[in-house]
Amino acid sequence: MESIGIVSPQTMHFSEPLRLQNGSSLANYDLVVETYGKLNAARSNAVLVCHALNASHHVAGVYADDPKNVGWWDNMVGPGKPLDTNRFFVIGVNNLGSCFGSTGPMSIDPSTGRPYGASFPVVTVEDWVNAQARVADEFGIEKFAAVMGGSLGGMQALAWSMMYPDRLEHCIVVASTPKLSAQNIAFNEVARSSILSDPDFHGGDYYAHGVKPKRGLRVARMIGHITYLSDDDMAAKFGRALRRAEGAEKAYNFNFDVEFEVESYLRYQGDKFADYFDANTYLLITRALDYFDPAKAYDGDLTAALAHTKAKYLIASFTTDWRFAPARSRELVKALLDHKRQVTYGEIDAPHGHDAFLLDDARYHNLMRAYYERIAAEVNA
């Protein structure tokens, strides 16, 4: 199927202070946005796509000056694709605290004239949703046809249905969870510790030193990447294959250089990530993941937390996702059904682990396509 083609981001400036959950406020901030498709006259065909940890507003298409930079969900969003831009007006928003153009630690603090660095406030999923709602206001969108996201993006979609129940018709939550488990928080803590202990971190103000804590970022990404893959997928891709020089006489080198293909792969992923991502952003986003727990205010009762929701839901999980296992999605489905909400649940048998939500799996995409057909019929009714 064809791509959406060449796209251009736009920066939206907001001067009305945004009150954050931690009690502080951002007086002025920018959000980078990309849109695809056309908003209809009734403004009823808009879909908000929320991004995960290392993604951004660049959901689909390519840039004229960087044709290799394909949108992170290009296989899902575009003409004739499951989220069909011939039918829907799709918005991607880069969240606060990111390193891809929206106001974050790398941005200049107007009160000091220097990058925010470690002084940038800790933000939450709820803060992001409030900021996204202001983007909707700027477009004159009173109600989204759907709010959609995978992983951390799914948490934002769920939060939308709880915080703004009258502003979305459908909520699509893919490979996500209503809260992190202790194990997931532990993975995030180990990743953050690798960054915080890097000598080049300088308390988060490494910009002034002209360095970047690449070693810490590299290890953080390696840890995270392991959790995004399934054991079966890693076995199929790498097994115990060795990275030997051609014609090598010995099976092992008997040192601590790269021996196995899986080691080489993780180091490559870590190096690539450390080149383009920001360490302070990584700390902020993983902490936002940790804090998301809408049931906390209801003594841990997820059913009670969802009492005021009104949306129709599509919840999708993947059998080999052990980061956010299907049991977590089923927990959400049960809580929604307790309120007799209209819920479609798909548990897709896919070998790729958590990252399956980003891949072009036929059963997964057929589910999404069928659901968006239903939404399109409602929009056009």
Curated annotation (Swiss-Prot):
UniProt site positions, description: Important for acyl-CoA specificity: 323
Span of domain AB hydrolase-1: 45-360
Active site positions: 151, 321, 354
Keyword line: Acyltransferase, Amino-acid biosynthesis, Cytoplasm, Methionine biosynthesis, Transferase
Compartments (UniProt record): Cytoplasm
Molecular functions (GO terms): homoserine O-acetyltransferase activity; homoserine O-succinyltransferase activity
EC number assigned by the record: 2.3.1.46
Subunit structure: Homodimer.
Assigned protein family: Belongs to the AB hydrolase superfamily. MetX family.
Physiological role: Transfers a succinyl group from succinyl-CoA to L-homoserine, forming succinyl-L-homoserine.
Name of the protein in its database record: Homoserine O-succinyltransferase
